[in-house]
Amino acid sequence: MGTPGSGRKRTPVKDRFSAEDEALSNIDREAEARLAAKRAARAEARDIRMRELERQQKELDEKSDKQYAENYTRPSSRNSASATTPLSGNSSRRVSGDTSSLIDPDTSLSELRESLSEVEEKYKKAMVSNAQLDNEKNNLIYQVDTLKDVIEEQEEQMAEFYRENEEKSKELERQKHMCSVLQHKMDELKEGLRQRDELIEKHGLVIIPDGTPNGDVHQEPAVGAITVVSQEAAQVLESAGEGPLDVRLRKLAGEKEELLSQIRKLKLQLEEERQKCSGRDGTAGDLAELQNGSDLQLIEMQRDANRQISEYKFKLSKAEQDITTLEQSISRLEGQVLRYRTAAENAEKVEDELKAEKRKLQRELRTALDKIEEMEMTNSHLAKRLEKMKANRTALLAQQ
Protein backbone atom coordinates (compact mmCIF):
# COMPACT_ATOMS: atom_id res chain seq x y z
CA MET A 1 0.00 0.00 0.00
CA GLY A 2 3.10 2.15 0.49
CA THR A 3 1.93 5.71 -0.27
CA PRO A 4 0.22 7.40 2.67
CA GLY A 5 -3.20 8.87 1.98
CA SER A 6 -5.62 11.08 3.77
CA GLY A 7 -8.25 8.31 4.15
CA ARG A 8 -11.33 8.80 6.23
CA LYS A 9 -11.22 8.48 10.02
CA ARG A 10 -12.57 5.17 11.18
CA THR A 11 -14.81 4.72 14.19
CA PRO A 12 -12.97 2.51 16.71
CA VAL A 13 -14.36 -0.97 16.99
CA LYS A 14 -14.00 -0.87 20.78
CA ASP A 15 -16.33 2.16 21.05
CA ARG A 16 -18.96 0.54 18.90
CA PHE A 17 -18.77 -2.68 20.90
CA SER A 18 -19.01 -0.73 24.18
CA ALA A 19 -22.11 1.08 22.85
CA GLU A 20 -23.70 -2.26 21.92
CA ASP A 21 -22.82 -3.74 25.31
CA GLU A 22 -24.32 -0.70 27.06
CA ALA A 23 -27.53 -1.04 25.02
CA LEU A 24 -27.75 -4.74 25.85
CA SER A 25 -27.10 -3.96 29.52
CA ASN A 26 -29.96 -1.43 29.49
CA ILE A 27 -32.24 -4.04 27.92
CA ASP A 28 -31.21 -6.58 30.56
CA ARG A 29 -31.86 -4.10 33.38
CA GLU A 30 -35.30 -3.25 32.00
CA ALA A 31 -36.10 -6.94 31.64
CA GLU A 32 -34.97 -7.63 35.21
CA ALA A 33 -37.10 -4.73 36.48
CA ARG A 34 -40.17 -6.07 34.65
CA LEU A 35 -39.43 -9.56 35.93
CA ALA A 36 -39.09 -8.29 39.52
CA ALA A 37 -42.44 -6.48 39.19
CA LYS A 38 -44.07 -9.64 37.89
CA ARG A 39 -42.55 -11.66 40.72
CA ALA A 40 -43.84 -9.19 43.31
CA ALA A 41 -47.33 -9.33 41.76
CA ARG A 42 -47.23 -13.13 41.74
CA ALA A 43 -46.06 -13.23 45.37
CA GLU A 44 -48.90 -10.93 46.41
CA ALA A 45 -51.41 -13.04 44.49
CA ARG A 46 -49.98 -16.16 46.05
CA ASP A 47 -50.35 -14.70 49.56
CA ILE A 48 -53.95 -13.73 48.83
CA ARG A 49 -54.64 -17.21 47.47
CA MET A 50 -53.04 -18.85 50.51
CA ARG A 51 -55.14 -16.70 52.88
CA GLU A 52 -58.27 -17.60 50.93
CA LEU A 53 -57.38 -21.29 51.07
CA GLU A 54 -56.75 -21.06 54.82
CA ARG A 55 -60.11 -19.37 55.31
CA GLN A 56 -61.87 -22.02 53.24
CA GLN A 57 -60.02 -24.73 55.16
CA LYS A 58 -61.11 -23.24 58.48
CA GLU A 59 -64.71 -23.15 57.31
CA LEU A 60 -64.46 -26.79 56.23
CA ASP A 61 -62.94 -27.70 59.60
CA GLU A 62 -65.73 -25.95 61.46
CA LYS A 63 -68.38 -27.65 59.32
CA SER A 64 -66.80 -31.05 59.82
CA ASP A 65 -66.57 -30.49 63.58
CA LYS A 66 -70.24 -29.57 63.71
CA GLN A 67 -71.20 -32.63 61.67
CA TYR A 68 -69.14 -34.93 63.89
CA ALA A 69 -70.66 -33.37 67.02
CA GLU A 70 -74.21 -33.79 65.70
CA ASN A 71 -73.61 -37.37 64.54
CA TYR A 72 -72.11 -38.56 67.86
CA THR A 73 -74.44 -36.76 70.27
CA ARG A 74 -77.52 -38.53 68.89
CA PRO A 75 -76.32 -42.15 69.48
CA SER A 76 -75.24 -41.36 73.03
CA SER A 77 -78.81 -40.18 73.92
CA ARG A 78 -80.30 -43.34 72.44
CA ASN A 79 -77.86 -45.50 74.38
CA SER A 80 -78.70 -43.78 77.67
CA ALA A 81 -82.43 -44.36 77.10
CA SER A 82 -81.94 -48.03 76.39
CA ALA A 83 -79.79 -48.42 79.49
CA THR A 84 -82.82 -47.58 81.72
CA THR A 85 -84.79 -50.64 80.54
CA PRO A 86 -85.34 -53.40 83.17
CA LEU A 87 -83.54 -55.98 81.06
CA SER A 88 -80.61 -56.75 83.27
CA GLY A 89 -79.12 -59.56 81.22
CA ASN A 90 -78.44 -57.43 78.14
CA SER A 91 -77.63 -54.23 80.00
CA SER A 92 -73.95 -55.03 80.48
CA ARG A 93 -73.42 -55.88 76.82
CA ARG A 94 -75.22 -52.73 75.69
CA VAL A 95 -73.19 -50.55 78.04
CA SER A 96 -69.96 -52.07 76.79
CA GLY A 97 -71.12 -51.58 73.18
CA ASP A 98 -72.10 -47.99 73.89
CA THR A 99 -68.75 -47.23 75.46
CA SER A 100 -66.91 -48.78 72.54
CA SER A 101 -69.06 -46.78 70.12
CA LEU A 102 -68.31 -43.60 72.07
CA ILE A 103 -64.57 -44.27 72.07
CA ASP A 104 -64.16 -45.28 68.39
CA PRO A 105 -65.57 -42.06 66.87
CA ASP A 106 -63.18 -39.98 68.97
CA THR A 107 -60.19 -41.95 67.83
CA SER A 108 -61.34 -41.84 64.19
CA LEU A 109 -61.92 -38.08 64.48
CA SER A 110 -58.41 -37.46 65.79
CA GLU A 111 -56.96 -39.63 63.07
CA LEU A 112 -58.98 -37.80 60.48
CA ARG A 113 -57.79 -34.49 61.84
CA GLU A 114 -54.20 -35.62 61.77
CA SER A 115 -54.55 -36.91 58.24
CA LEU A 116 -56.34 -33.70 57.30
CA SER A 117 -53.53 -31.60 58.77
CA GLU A 118 -50.99 -33.71 56.88
CA VAL A 119 -52.98 -33.28 53.70
CA GLU A 120 -53.15 -29.55 54.37
CA GLU A 121 -49.39 -29.37 54.86
CA LYS A 122 -48.81 -31.36 51.71
CA TYR A 123 -51.30 -29.17 49.89
CA LYS A 124 -49.57 -26.01 51.13
CA LYS A 125 -46.18 -27.39 50.11
CA ALA A 126 -47.57 -28.39 46.75
CA MET A 127 -49.09 -24.95 46.29
CA VAL A 128 -45.81 -23.25 47.25
CA SER A 129 -43.77 -25.50 44.95
CA ASN A 130 -46.34 -24.99 42.21
CA ALA A 131 -46.09 -21.22 42.64
CA GLN A 132 -42.30 -21.41 42.57
CA LEU A 133 -42.35 -23.58 39.48
CA ASP A 134 -44.83 -21.19 37.90
CA ASN A 135 -42.54 -18.26 38.66
CA GLU A 136 -39.52 -20.10 37.32
CA LYS A 137 -41.46 -21.11 34.23
CA ASN A 138 -42.54 -17.53 33.59
CA ASN A 139 -39.00 -16.32 34.20
CA LEU A 140 -37.56 -18.86 31.78
CA ILE A 141 -40.23 -18.05 29.19
CA TYR A 142 -39.39 -14.36 29.50
CA GLN A 143 -35.67 -15.08 29.18
CA VAL A 144 -36.31 -17.28 26.15
CA ASP A 145 -38.41 -14.54 24.54
CA THR A 146 -35.69 -11.98 25.28
CA LEU A 147 -33.04 -14.26 23.83
CA LYS A 148 -35.20 -14.84 20.77
CA ASP A 149 -35.51 -11.09 20.27
CA VAL A 150 -31.77 -10.64 20.69
CA ILE A 151 -31.07 -13.52 18.30
CA GLU A 152 -33.42 -12.04 15.72
CA GLU A 153 -31.71 -8.66 16.04
CA GLN A 154 -28.30 -10.31 15.73
CA GLU A 155 -29.46 -12.29 12.70
CA GLU A 156 -30.72 -9.09 11.08
CA GLN A 157 -27.41 -7.39 11.82
CA MET A 158 -25.53 -10.39 10.46
CA ALA A 159 -27.63 -10.33 7.29
CA GLU A 160 -26.95 -6.60 6.94
CA PHE A 161 -23.24 -7.18 7.47
CA TYR A 162 -23.27 -9.98 4.91
CA ARG A 163 -24.97 -7.68 2.41
CA GLU A 164 -22.47 -4.91 3.07
CA ASN A 165 -19.63 -7.42 2.80
CA GLU A 166 -20.98 -8.66 -0.52
CA GLU A 167 -21.30 -5.09 -1.82
CA LYS A 168 -17.78 -4.25 -0.69
CA SER A 169 -16.50 -7.45 -2.28
CA LYS A 170 -18.17 -6.50 -5.56
CA GLU A 171 -16.71 -3.00 -5.31
CA LEU A 172 -13.30 -4.52 -4.61
CA GLU A 173 -13.64 -6.76 -7.68
CA ARG A 174 -14.55 -3.72 -9.78
CA GLN A 175 -11.55 -1.83 -8.45
CA LYS A 176 -9.32 -4.81 -9.19
CA HIS A 177 -10.73 -4.95 -12.72
CA MET A 178 -10.03 -1.23 -13.18
CA CYS A 179 -6.50 -1.77 -11.85
CA SER A 180 -5.97 -4.60 -14.34
CA VAL A 181 -7.29 -2.41 -17.19
CA LEU A 182 -4.97 0.44 -16.19
CA GLN A 183 -2.08 -2.00 -15.87
CA HIS A 184 -2.87 -3.27 -19.38
CA LYS A 185 -2.86 0.31 -20.69
CA MET A 186 0.44 0.95 -18.94
CA ASP A 187 1.91 -2.19 -20.52
CA GLU A 188 0.70 -0.99 -23.93
CA LEU A 189 2.36 2.40 -23.35
CA LYS A 190 5.58 0.68 -22.32
CA GLU A 191 5.41 -1.48 -25.44
CA GLY A 192 4.87 1.68 -27.54
CA LEU A 193 7.90 3.30 -25.93
CA ARG A 194 9.96 0.19 -26.61
CA GLN A 195 8.89 0.14 -30.27
CA ARG A 196 9.70 3.86 -30.50
CA ASP A 197 13.19 3.22 -29.17
CA GLU A 198 13.63 0.36 -31.62
CA LEU A 199 12.53 2.56 -34.54
CA ILE A 200 14.85 5.35 -33.41
CA GLU A 201 17.73 2.90 -33.21
CA LYS A 202 16.78 1.29 -36.53
CA HIS A 203 16.76 4.59 -38.44
CA GLY A 204 19.94 5.77 -36.81
CA LEU A 205 18.39 8.65 -34.94
CA VAL A 206 19.67 10.19 -31.74
CA ILE A 207 17.65 11.25 -28.67
CA ILE A 208 18.57 14.69 -27.40
CA PRO A 209 17.13 15.80 -24.05
CA ASP A 210 15.51 19.23 -24.07
CA GLY A 211 16.51 20.61 -20.71
CA THR A 212 14.88 24.03 -20.72
CA PRO A 213 11.95 24.70 -23.06
CA ASN A 214 11.80 27.98 -25.00
CA GLY A 215 15.41 28.67 -24.07
CA ASP A 216 14.58 30.02 -20.61
CA VAL A 217 17.43 28.93 -18.40
CA HIS A 218 15.59 30.11 -15.28
CA GLN A 219 12.59 27.85 -15.93
CA GLU A 220 12.28 24.44 -14.31
CA PRO A 221 13.37 21.63 -16.68
CA ALA A 222 10.50 19.66 -18.20
CA VAL A 223 10.52 16.04 -17.09
CA GLY A 224 10.67 13.59 -19.99
CA ALA A 225 11.02 16.27 -22.76
CA ILE A 226 13.18 14.73 -25.50
CA THR A 227 13.95 15.36 -29.17
CA VAL A 228 14.87 12.80 -31.83
CA VAL A 229 17.22 13.91 -34.62
CA SER A 230 19.45 12.25 -37.18
CA GLN A 231 23.10 11.58 -36.52
CA GLU A 232 24.21 14.34 -38.91
CA ALA A 233 21.93 16.82 -37.17
CA ALA A 234 23.21 15.56 -33.82
CA GLN A 235 26.79 16.21 -34.95
CA VAL A 236 25.78 19.69 -36.10
CA LEU A 237 24.10 20.32 -32.76
CA GLU A 238 27.16 19.01 -30.92
CA SER A 239 29.32 21.42 -32.90
CA ALA A 240 27.07 24.19 -31.59
CA GLY A 241 28.23 23.44 -28.05
CA GLU A 242 26.45 22.48 -24.85
CA GLY A 243 23.09 23.70 -23.68
CA PRO A 244 19.39 23.31 -24.44
CA LEU A 245 18.17 22.59 -27.93
CA ASP A 246 16.66 26.05 -28.46
CA VAL A 247 19.91 27.75 -27.45
CA ARG A 248 21.93 25.58 -29.82
CA LEU A 249 19.47 26.23 -32.66
CA ARG A 250 19.78 29.97 -32.05
CA LYS A 251 23.57 29.60 -32.15
CA LEU A 252 23.32 27.77 -35.47
CA ALA A 253 20.99 30.46 -36.80
CA GLY A 254 23.49 33.14 -35.71
CA GLU A 255 26.33 31.27 -37.41
CA LYS A 256 24.16 31.01 -40.53
CA GLU A 257 23.62 34.77 -40.53
CA GLU A 258 27.35 35.34 -40.08
CA LEU A 259 28.14 33.00 -42.96
CA LEU A 260 25.57 34.74 -45.15
CA SER A 261 27.08 38.13 -44.31
CA GLN A 262 30.55 36.78 -45.08
CA ILE A 263 29.28 35.42 -48.40
CA ARG A 264 27.82 38.77 -49.28
CA LYS A 265 31.10 40.46 -48.41
CA LEU A 266 33.01 37.92 -50.49
CA LYS A 267 30.67 38.50 -53.42
CA LEU A 268 31.27 42.22 -53.17
CA GLN A 269 35.03 41.71 -53.00
CA LEU A 270 34.81 39.35 -55.98
CA GLU A 271 32.95 41.93 -58.00
CA GLU A 272 35.52 44.55 -57.09
CA GLU A 273 38.36 42.25 -58.11
CA ARG A 274 36.62 41.49 -61.40
CA GLN A 275 36.20 45.19 -62.07
CA LYS A 276 39.84 45.78 -61.21
CA CYS A 277 40.91 42.94 -63.47
CA SER A 278 38.80 44.26 -66.38
CA GLY A 279 40.29 47.74 -65.86
CA ARG A 280 43.76 46.29 -65.85
CA ASP A 281 43.10 44.35 -69.06
CA GLY A 282 41.87 47.59 -70.79
CA THR A 283 44.93 49.60 -69.85
CA ALA A 284 47.40 46.76 -70.33
CA GLY A 285 47.83 47.47 -74.14
CA ASP A 286 48.51 51.12 -73.63
CA LEU A 287 50.98 50.59 -70.87
CA ALA A 288 52.78 47.63 -72.43
CA GLU A 289 55.85 49.60 -73.28
CA LEU A 290 55.87 51.35 -69.92
CA GLN A 291 55.39 48.27 -67.87
CA ASN A 292 57.65 45.75 -69.53
CA GLY A 293 59.62 45.53 -66.36
CA SER A 294 56.55 44.90 -64.21
CA ASP A 295 54.92 42.09 -66.27
CA LEU A 296 55.99 39.48 -63.87
CA GLN A 297 54.39 41.35 -61.01
CA LEU A 298 51.10 41.69 -62.89
CA ILE A 299 51.11 38.00 -63.74
CA GLU A 300 51.79 37.14 -60.15
CA MET A 301 49.01 39.45 -58.99
CA GLN A 302 46.61 37.92 -61.51
CA ARG A 303 47.54 34.46 -60.30
CA ASP A 304 46.94 35.49 -56.72
CA ALA A 305 43.64 37.08 -57.64
CA ASN A 306 42.56 34.02 -59.61
CA ARG A 307 43.60 31.78 -56.74
CA GLN A 308 41.68 33.91 -54.25
CA ILE A 309 38.68 33.99 -56.56
CA SER A 310 38.71 30.20 -56.89
CA GLU A 311 39.08 29.84 -53.14
CA TYR A 312 36.25 32.29 -52.55
CA LYS A 313 34.08 30.46 -55.08
CA PHE A 314 34.82 27.14 -53.39
CA LYS A 315 34.07 28.62 -49.96
CA LEU A 316 30.93 30.20 -51.35
CA SER A 317 29.67 26.95 -52.82
CA LYS A 318 30.56 25.09 -49.66
CA ALA A 319 28.86 27.73 -47.53
CA GLU A 320 25.78 27.59 -49.75
CA GLN A 321 25.71 23.81 -49.40
CA ASP A 322 26.16 24.09 -45.63
CA ILE A 323 23.43 26.71 -45.48
CA THR A 324 21.07 24.53 -47.51
CA THR A 325 21.89 21.51 -45.33
CA LEU A 326 21.43 23.54 -42.18
CA GLU A 327 18.14 24.97 -43.40
CA GLN A 328 16.87 21.50 -44.22
CA SER A 329 18.12 20.17 -40.88
CA ILE A 330 16.55 23.09 -39.04
CA SER A 331 13.19 22.63 -40.75
CA ARG A 332 13.32 18.89 -40.15
CA LEU A 333 14.40 19.41 -36.56
CA GLU A 334 11.67 21.95 -35.98
CA GLY A 335 9.07 19.50 -37.31
CA GLN A 336 10.51 16.68 -35.21
CA VAL A 337 10.69 18.94 -32.16
CA LEU A 338 7.08 19.96 -32.60
CA ARG A 339 5.92 16.40 -33.19
CA TYR A 340 7.89 14.84 -30.35
CA ARG A 341 7.05 17.68 -28.00
CA THR A 342 3.36 17.07 -28.70
CA ALA A 343 3.85 13.33 -28.18
CA ALA A 344 5.78 13.97 -24.96
CA GLU A 345 3.08 16.30 -23.66
CA ASN A 346 0.39 13.73 -24.46
CA ALA A 347 2.45 11.00 -22.82
CA GLU A 348 2.97 13.19 -19.73
CA LYS A 349 -0.77 13.88 -19.54
CA VAL A 350 -1.57 10.17 -19.87
CA GLU A 351 1.09 9.33 -17.28
CA ASP A 352 -0.25 11.94 -14.84
CA GLU A 353 -3.79 10.64 -15.34
CA LEU A 354 -2.63 7.07 -14.80
CA LYS A 355 -0.72 8.06 -11.66
CA ALA A 356 -3.72 9.95 -10.29
CA GLU A 357 -6.02 7.02 -11.09
CA LYS A 358 -3.56 4.62 -9.51
CA ARG A 359 -3.36 6.70 -6.31
CA LYS A 360 -7.16 6.93 -6.23
CA LEU A 361 -7.50 3.18 -6.67
CA GLN A 362 -4.91 2.54 -3.98
CA ARG A 363 -6.80 4.80 -1.56
CA GLU A 364 -10.09 3.09 -2.38
CA LEU A 365 -8.44 -0.32 -2.03
CA ARG A 366 -7.03 0.61 1.39
CA THR A 367 -10.43 1.93 2.47
CA ALA A 368 -12.16 -1.24 1.26
CA LEU A 369 -9.61 -3.45 3.03
CA ASP A 370 -10.04 -1.46 6.26
CA LYS A 371 -13.82 -1.82 6.02
CA ILE A 372 -13.53 -5.55 5.32
CA GLU A 373 -11.20 -5.98 8.30
CA GLU A 374 -13.57 -3.99 10.51
CA MET A 375 -16.56 -6.05 9.36
CA GLU A 376 -14.64 -9.28 9.94
CA MET A 377 -13.85 -8.19 13.50
CA THR A 378 -17.50 -7.23 14.04
CA ASN A 379 -18.63 -10.52 12.53
CA SER A 380 -16.32 -12.54 14.78
CA HIS A 381 -17.47 -10.58 17.84
CA LEU A 382 -21.14 -11.10 16.97
CA ALA A 383 -20.53 -14.77 16.23
CA LYS A 384 -18.95 -15.23 19.66
CA ARG A 385 -21.88 -13.47 21.33
CA LEU A 386 -24.34 -15.55 19.33
CA GLU A 387 -22.58 -18.77 20.35
CA LYS A 388 -22.65 -17.62 23.97
CA MET A 389 -26.39 -16.87 23.73
CA LYS A 390 -27.02 -20.25 22.12
CA ALA A 391 -25.08 -21.95 24.92
CA ASN A 392 -27.09 -20.06 27.56
CA ARG A 393 -30.31 -20.96 25.81
CA THR A 394 -29.32 -24.63 25.63
CA ALA A 395 -28.45 -24.59 29.34
CA LEU A 396 -31.80 -22.98 30.20
CA LEU A 397 -33.69 -25.52 28.11
CA ALA A 398 -31.75 -28.34 29.75
CA GLN A 399 -32.62 -27.00 33.21
CA GLN A 400 -36.27 -26.68 32.23
From Swiss-Prot:
Protein task: May function as activator of the canonical Wnt signaling pathway, in association with DVL3, upstream of CTNNB1/beta-catenin. Positively regulates Toll-like receptor (TLR) signaling in response to agonist probably by competing with the negative FLII regulator for MYD88-binding.
Residues bearing PTM Phosphothreonine: 99
Coiled coil: 29-71, 106-202, 245-393
Source organism superkingdom: Eukaryota
Gene3D superfamilies: 1.20.5.4090
Organism phylogeny: Eukaryota, Metazoa, Chordata, Craniata, Vertebrata
Xref: InterPro entries: LRRFIP1/2
Transmembrane region(s): none
Membership in a protein family: Belongs to the LRRFIP family.
Protein name, entry field: Leucine-rich repeat flightless-interacting protein 2
Gene encoding the protein: LRRFIP2
Compositional bias annotation for Polar residues: 73-102
Modified residues (Phosphoserine): 18, 77, 80, 88, 92, 96, 100-101
Family matches, as PANTHER family: LEUCINE RICH REPEAT IN FLII INTERACTING PROTEIN, LEUCINE-RICH REPEAT FLIGHTLESS-INTERACTING PROTEIN 2
Keyword Transmembrane helix: no
Oligomeric and partner information: Interacts with DVL3 and FLII. Weakly interacts with MYD88 in resting cells. Following LPS-stimulation, the interaction with MYD88 is rapidly enhanced; the complex gradually dissociates to basal levels after 6 hours of stimulation. Interaction with MYD88 is regulated by LPS-induced phosphorylation. In the presence of LPS, competes with FLII for MYD88-binding.
Region (Disordered), start-end ranges: 1-28, 53-119
One record GO biological process: regulation of DNA-templated transcription
Entry keywords, A to Z: Coiled coil, Phosphoprotein, Wnt signaling pathway
Record-linked Pfam families: LRRFIP (PF09738)
Biased composition (Basic and acidic residues): 53-68
